[in-house]
Amino acid sequence: MIEVPCPICQKSVPWINESTFRPFCSKRCQLIDLGEWAAEEKAIPSDTADFAMDPNVSDEWSIK
């Protein structure tokens, strides 16, 4: 059986269907992680993240 560390508390989590919150060990750790994303403490790196700030980018798709 494969075990992975919980991304929040590092507790060992078995990677099986019965592990309801995998890769998290509990609902609490799952919600802590969600809160970090919602508070923008975590982000996926991207070269195009600032496209909205670029005046040269067309916004034809936006509703006016």
From Swiss-Prot:
SUPFAM superfamilies: Glucocorticoid receptor-like (DNA-binding domain). Zn(2+) binds at C6, C9, C25, C29. Binds 1 zinc ion. GO terms for biological process: regulation of DNA-templated transcription. Gene3D superfamilies: Erythroid Transcription Factor GATA-1, subunit A. Keywords: Metal-binding, Zinc. It comes from the Bacteria. GO terms for molecular function: DNA topoisomerase type II (double strand cut, ATP-hydrolyzing) inhibitor activity; zinc ion binding. Its cofactor is Zn(2+). InterPro entries: DNA_gyrase_inhibitor_YacG, Znf_NHR/GATA. Belongs to the DNA gyrase inhibitor YacG family. Interacts with GyrB. Inhibits all the catalytic activities of DNA gyrase by preventing its interaction with DNA. Acts by binding directly to the C-terminal domain of GyrB, which probably disrupts DNA binding by the gyrase. This is DNA gyrase inhibitor YacG. It comes from Haemophilus influenzae (strain ATCC 51907 / DSM 11121 / KW20 / Rd).
